[in-house]
């Protein structure tokens, strides 16, 4: 393509001010403290749909078992997180096929930072696979 219609690479940096951190989940812990999930969305496109983000979970944060309406890749950058019964330290790559569920997630004592990419519709559907089947019908 030529001129104004040419496609170009898009560059973002974790410290860019135009990409704010967003609190997307919060829980009250048994000891009265709160834990949160914060996300910084680097790309959120609709055609074709995809989402890439950096996520930070406070220590002890729990996210229910769920799945997404698209393939989902997670890479643990710092800290650790439990995914179900499996501990995932820094360096762990998790691949979730469309229609599969994972979790529950529980952030480790130091919290966790993860890079995530959802290659399609990023909305989640809980841990009931029949909901995904109904969406596909």
Predicted regions and their residues:
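Residues that flank catalytic or metal-binding motifs in active/ligand-binding sites
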Residues: 38, 72, 110
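Ligand-binding loop in jelly-roll beta-barrel domains
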Residues: 87, 98-125
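Preference for bulky hydrophobic residues occupying beta-strand positions
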Residues: 55, 75, 94, 116-117
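A short, N-terminal "cap"/entry segment at the start of jelly-roll beta-barrel domains
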Residues: 1-47, 130-137
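Conserved short histidine dyad/triad with adjacent acidic residue
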Residues: 35-67, 87, 97-101, 135
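A short secondary-structure junction signal
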Residues: 53, 126-128
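Glycine- and acidic-residue-biased ligand/ion/polar-headgroup-sensing regions
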Residues: 59, 68-83
């Amino acid at each position: 393509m030529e001129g104004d219609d040419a496609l170009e690479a898009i560059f973002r940096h974790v410290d860019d001010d135009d990409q704010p951190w967003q609190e997307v989940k919060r829980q009250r812990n048994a000891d009265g403290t709160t834990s949160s999930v914060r996300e910084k969305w680097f790309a959120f496109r609709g055609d074709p749909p995809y989402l890439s983000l950096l996520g930070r979970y406070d220590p002890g944060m729990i996210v229910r078992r769920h799945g997404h309406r698209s393939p989902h890749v997670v890479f643990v950058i710092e800290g650790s997180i439990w995914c179900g019964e499996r501990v995932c330290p820094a360096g762990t790559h998790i691949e979730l096929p469309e229609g599969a569920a994972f979790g529950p997630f529980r952030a480790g004592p130091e919290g966790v930072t993860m890079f995530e990419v959802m290659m399609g519709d990023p909305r989640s559907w809980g841990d009931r696979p029949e909901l995904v089947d109904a969406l596909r019908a």
